[in-house]
Amino acid sequence: PTFVKEFRSAVEQAKTLGVSLQVILGLGDSPDFKSLIREIRNRQPPVTYWLVRGGDPSDFHAAQKQLSAIGQGSKMGVTRVTNFVDLNRARPESDLVQAVGFAINPQIHAFDHASIVESLPMHAEVVENARQFTGDRPLVIGPITMTPQLLDGNDEYGGLLRGGALPTFVDGRQVEPFTAAWTLGSLKYLADASVDSATFFETVGWNGLMDIDDVSARPQEFPSKPGSVF
C-alpha cells in the first residue's frame, strides 16, 4: 500500500531527529489495518497521537478498536485537515476521544502579505474557541502550512495545478523570509493559547523546512535548489 512507504519514511525521520510522531489516519472505504499494525509491530514507531481524519464517529471507533489492541500507549484522537470551522461543525462527542486537532492555514479568503499577517491573532482565538468543547483533552494543532493541504473526504492533495506551475498545496513564498516570520508569529499566538502541540510544514520538500537533495529543476515560481534551507 502507498501509505506504508510514507509511514516508513516518517518513522525513519522521527527516529533520526529524536522526535515523536502524530499520525493522521485517513481511513477511506476499506482501511488496511492489517498492514498498519504489521508496520507498527515491526518498526515500533514513536507515535504520541493517532488522529483519525474527518468527522465520522464510526471511523474513529474502528481505528480505536484496532489500535488499542496493540497496546502502544499512544493516545487516540480526531482531527480535521481543513480548518477549525469543520471541526466546530462536527464536534467530537465520544468519551474515548483522547485528543483533538485541526489544521491552520492563512489562505482561505485572502492571499496577500498584509492579510496573512493580520490573521495571526486568530490562531489563538480558534484555540480558545476549541477549548470550549474539547475540555481538558490535548489540542494537537497541525498541519500548519501556508496553503490548504488535504481536503476532508478526498485522499488527493489540493488537486489542480495553479496556472500550470505550482500545485495548489504549494506556495512559492515557502522559500522566503516572509514565511519564517509568519511561522514565528504563529508560534507566538499558539504558545499564548497554551496548545499542547503544534506541527508546522513538513521536514523536506515543497512544504518543508528545506528542499530535497535529489530534486529536479523547480518551476520559476518556486526558486529553490537541491538541499536549500528555507
Each predicted region: which residue ranges?
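Aromatic-lined substrate-binding rim segments of carbohydrate-active enzymes
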Residues: 2-42, 57-74, 118-120
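Noncatalytic carbohydrate-binding groove/subsite architecture in carbohydrate-active enzymes
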Residues: 53-177
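Short, acidic/polar
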Residues: 7, 30-42, 84-92, 178-188
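Structured alpha-helical segments in the cores of large, soluble enzyme domains
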Residues: 7-10, 126-132, 186-188
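Short, well-ordered coil/turn segments that N-cap beta-strands
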Residues: 15-21, 44-48, 72-75, 96-98, ...
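Aromatic/acidic polysaccharide-binding cleft in carbohydrate-active enzymes
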Residues: 142-228
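Structural recognition of alpha->loop->beta junctions
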Residues: 38-50, 92-103, 185-197
